[in-house]
């Protein structure tokens, strides 16, 4: 409560716990932390349910960034995981050697390829 630096508070919590300051800090902090936590838990759970499903649907429908592709890869089924693993290995491997795969990275052979996403690169490399 009276600490200004987080480092000092950590030192007091670790070293001073044996003396009895740790128990005093716990008693003082617990009610102050619990009451906002209980208040925040109710609405936070309801708010997090709907965006969670929305995020999963968005990630599965439009995987654009690396974070969304990882989330969609985790949320998908085991059969999809194998396809994702294959597509990721295909998209990361042909950076240097075969010219046919490098040619397909430009989306010239697949009309459905909009931008250079990992999700769209893998089918382009497979079809070519």
Curated annotation (Swiss-Prot):
One annotated GO biological process: double-strand break repair via homologous recombination
Region described as Disordered: spans on this chain: 22-42
GO CC terms of this entry: proteasome complex
InterPro entries (UniProt xref): DUF5543
Domain of life: Eukaryota
Pfam families reported for this sequence: DUF5543
Protein name: Putative protein SEM1, isoform 2
